[in-house]
Amino acid sequence: KRIETYFDPLPFYYEPLEVRLTDTQRYPLNALTQRPMAMYHSWDSQNAWLRQIHSHNYLFVSPRVGAANGFDDGDWIWVESPHGKVRCMCRFSEAVEPGTVWTWNAIGKAAGSWGLTARADEARKGFLLNHLISEELPPTECGEHVSNSDPVTGQAAWFDVRVRVYKAGPDEPKVTSPQFSPMPLLPGQGKRRGRWQAYVAGLFGQK
């Protein structure tokens, strides 16, 4: 049925399958993910210079969305979908379409992974939108569960999720949520003493 309906030789617009089963009044925004050019998962994430530039990600939103939802640039906010929610920091950008929010994915990591300490920005401020995306569509009226994927290629529908955003409470911790227990060291993986790179030699009392 999917191939018969959507596998057309000419491109045409159709409403994403997940959106048809989502309350778009409650979840009015489209959420997208991109990748920073310099880093993806472990690729280049151990470069000390790059980590100073972008050691964690933000949720980029239009200033109009922030004004409508009562939060400012740099605030901690919640981004919520029908499947889950994430607490993160926001960043205003006029380049973001008001009906859309987006972030760099693959920067948020659990403490302990790749030698990151519990104080690392990746673990305390970085986040993933994966927690908001389901592998299955909401059940139909008959209770049927269908894969949340492109109807033709089968690619996971990462760009189809709908969300809402709102300001985090003043008493909430200034760390991303959800948080996970630090990953244990693997056998033979010992703690290493940190070493400064050459470009910071002479700082912090180091000669």
What are these regions (language model features)?
Residues 1-47:
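Long, low-complexity segments enriched in small/aliphatic residues
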Residues 44-60, 64-207:
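Long, contiguous, secondary-structure-rich segments that constitute the structural scaffold
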